Amino acid sequence: MSDALIRLDKVAVTLSGQNVLDDIQLSVKPGEIVTLIGPNGAGKTTLVRAVLGLLKPDSGTVWRKPKLRVGYMPQKLHVDQTLPLSVLRFLRLVPGVDRTAAASALEEVGAGKVIDSPIQGISGGEMQRVLLARALLRKPELLVLDEPVQGVDVAGQAELYSLITRLRDRHRCGVLMVSHDLHLVMSTTDQVVCLNRHVCCSGHPEQVSHDPAFVELFGKNAQSLAIYHHHHDHAHDLHGAVVNDAAPLSHTHVHGDSCKHG
């Protein structure tokens, strides 16, 4: 296990009598980017909680490198509008952080100008970068990013993906990223894992970023994006259970070599 930062082995979680995660196998190595995708209710948030140690699985194991430093970027942050909180004060909630460290982290993510702004007054894109800066302040070996491009347009997504790649290269940290998009992912992703309570399939995203039509559609940061094709041999009902019906379904796909579901 020494080559991994974190490894999940046959992890299963049951909540309120429902199987939320079943037989999950997942690992992230230093410098590796793993993107977790899946529909709403697929168990992505539960898996992240297990990775962060906030939830103990009912069976299976979650192994972490001893003294692993984790930087977590939440999906969103709700701040009371009446709370007098600047970006600097927010970042200084991280133990040991002073103005110099906060300014350096903000500059690294391209948000240096907002350091003294009220956190309630910055844009959604600026908030994403502030949350990313906060995660970096922990000098992480593993970055866990929960839908970091949520609410950002496609051009903004490409820009943020380029930034995340640069941060990975600079800090040599592993990255576990949750994405709401089932097909458009970061091109530098080493592995895409499609989750719907179990691992439906996994693999490397198709590199289409140099296609002229793709570049025209997504602009100068098109190289940051790639398409992921799913390879399922099964479908799920409305409750997430696997449907073993011999009749063909419009959303059932050919089983690929990378599929983890037997």
UniProtKB/Swiss-Prot annotation:
It comes from Pseudomonas syringae pv. syringae (strain B728a). The keyword Membrane applies. The keyword Cell membrane applies. The gene is znuC. It comes from the Bacteria. The complex is composed of two ATP-binding proteins (ZnuC), two transmembrane proteins (ZnuB) and a solute-binding protein (ZnuA). This is Zinc import ATP-binding protein ZnuC. It holds the Pfam family ABC_tran. One of its GO terms (molecular function) is ATP binding. It catalyses: Zn(2+)(out) + ATP(in) + H2O(in) = Zn(2+)(in) + ADP(in) + phosphate(in) + H(+)(in). Its EC number is 7.2.2.20. Part of the ABC transporter complex ZnuABC involved in zinc import. Responsible for energy coupling to the transport system.
